[in-house]
């Protein structure tokens, strides 16, 4: 392959950037509601990264980036995670709901003008008004949620299901936030599928 040396990190030089590699819009899926015209995005904006180019020796099975990375909070006491609602026609943010921790939860939106999401270290699965973002309901699960909500109906009754179980990036980044803030967050492990019936 060919490389442009102007875009190759220089050894010994560092760059700061916000949000970090785990920020902005990460892997948890967003959802679009054609009735509201809004797209709902799980986002993590209030943290930054520092990358410094360095000489490294390749070791099979380990990270090999040629860089040292650090993690910092943009505002140490502020929120990190959000649900953002954006108007697809105007490109404007309509509302956001902020969380103290990262938001690793995929989003489900329904024809009943609701959105469902988990993803925060407090272990809550939440329902919000899709037009305003107002929290309408919450349920604390046994563990954190990094799964994606789904919905289905049986004999005309609508259900929403979610899998709880904390780990991977969510657990690692929670530990890094704790290190920055001088806190200790405990999120129990263990996977469970939760199913909730929507009211008639």
Label each region the model flagged.
Residues 1-200:
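Beta-sheet-rich non-transmembrane sensory/scaffold domains
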């Amino acid at each position: 392959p060919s490389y442009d040396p102007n875009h190759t990190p220089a050894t010994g030089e560092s760059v700061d950037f916000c949000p970090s590699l785990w920020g902005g819009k990460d892997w948890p899926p967003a959802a679009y509601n054609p009735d509201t015209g809004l797209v709902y995005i799980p986002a993590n904006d209030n943290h930054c990264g520092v990358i410094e180019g360095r000489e490294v020796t390749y070791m099979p099975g380990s990270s090999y980036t040629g860089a040292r990375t650090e993690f910092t909070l943009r505002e140490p006491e502020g929120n990190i995670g959000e649900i953002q609602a954006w108007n697809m026609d105007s490109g404007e943010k309509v509302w956001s709901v902020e969380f103290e921790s990262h938001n690793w939860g995929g989003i489900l939106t329904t024809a009943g003008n609701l959105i469902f999401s988990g993803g925060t270290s407090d272990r809550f699965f939440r329902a919000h008004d899709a037009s305003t973002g107002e929290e309408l309901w919450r349920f604390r699960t046994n563990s954190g949620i990094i799964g994606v909500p789904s919905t289905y109906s049986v004999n005309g009754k609508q259900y929403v299901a979610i899998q709880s179980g904390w780990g991977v990036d969510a657990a690692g980044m929670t530990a890094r936030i704790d290190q920055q803030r001088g806190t200790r967050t405990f999120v129990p492990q263990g996977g469970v599928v939760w199913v909730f019936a929507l009211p008639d």
